[in-house]
């Protein structure tokens, strides 16, 4: 069984690996990227570094294989990333705004995100200001670890939050719905399913 514990600075490489290996709608996205760390620089590392009180990992005998990361105030987190996180990455990754969207690779889409991070839609933040990201490697899936991580994290924000799930990832949507998350209909692009808990 996995142990749930607070994230530590030395977990950062594991967070990057997990983020990459779940980046293809829950499956291993390694083949989709030239830079294996770029996606983690968006969806994992900033939370571990800027919001350590809201970062937890699941660790088994083979190491860290899951995480839940987030922020209690989405707008404050977006502002902090703009001030403290994105500037350094913008020096490392060139803006790809000049590449037509239909031609962009995964790396180019993520570089575009770094330069033009989309704010969470206001109706989502109004429903629940906190947000999270949760990912588990296959060896921890279906064993109650996701629920344990969710329980631990939601307790840190008073049990109210939102998340965005890829519409092409029905397995994740089923997990959230079983836990008690509800869909917010008619918000944002159809490629993302916005969900809230406790709202």
Language model: regions and residue ranges:
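Active-site rim helix/loop that mediates acceptor-substrate recognition in acyltransferases
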Residues: 32-55, 61
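A short beta-loop-alpha structural element at the N-terminal edge
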Residues: 3-17
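Conserved GNAT-fold acetyl-CoA-binding loop/helix
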Residues: 23-43, 79-94, 98
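Conserved acyl-donor/pantetheine-binding loop and adjacent beta-alpha core of acyl/acetyltransferases
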Residues: 75-133
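Conserved glycine-rich acetyl-CoA-binding loop
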Residues: 125-127, 134-151, 167-174, 178
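Conserved catalytic-core motifs of GNAT/GCN5-like acyltransferases
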Residues: 74-75, 164, 177-196
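Conserved beta-strand in the GNAT
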Residues: 57, 63-72
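Conserved GNAT acetyl-CoA-binding A-motif
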Residues: 128-130, 157-167
């Amino acid at each position: 069984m996995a142990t749930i514990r607070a994230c530590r600075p030395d977990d950062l490489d594991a967070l990057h690996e997990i983020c990459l290996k779940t980046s293809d709608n829950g499956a291993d996205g390694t083949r989709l990227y030239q830079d294996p760390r770029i996606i983690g620089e968006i969806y994992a590392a900033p939370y571990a570094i800027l919001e350590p009180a809201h970062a937890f990992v699941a660790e088994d005998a083979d190491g860290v294989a899951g995480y839940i990361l987030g922020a209690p105030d989405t707008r404050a987190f977006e502002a902090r990333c703009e001030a403290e996180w994105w500037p350094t990455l913008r020096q490392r990754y060139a803006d790809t705004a000049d590449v037509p969207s239909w031609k962009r690779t995964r790396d180019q889409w993520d570089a575009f995100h770094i330069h033009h991070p989309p704010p969470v839609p206001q109706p989502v933040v109004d429903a629940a200001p906190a947000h999270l990201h949760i990912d588990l490697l296959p060896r921890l899936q279906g064993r109650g670890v996701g629920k344990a991580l969710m329980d631990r994290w939601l307790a840190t924000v008073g049990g109210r939050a939102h998340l965005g799930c890829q519409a092409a990832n029905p397995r994740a949507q089923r997990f959230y719905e079983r836990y008690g998350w509800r869909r917010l209909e008619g918000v944002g692009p159809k490629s993302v399913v916005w969900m809230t808990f406790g709202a």
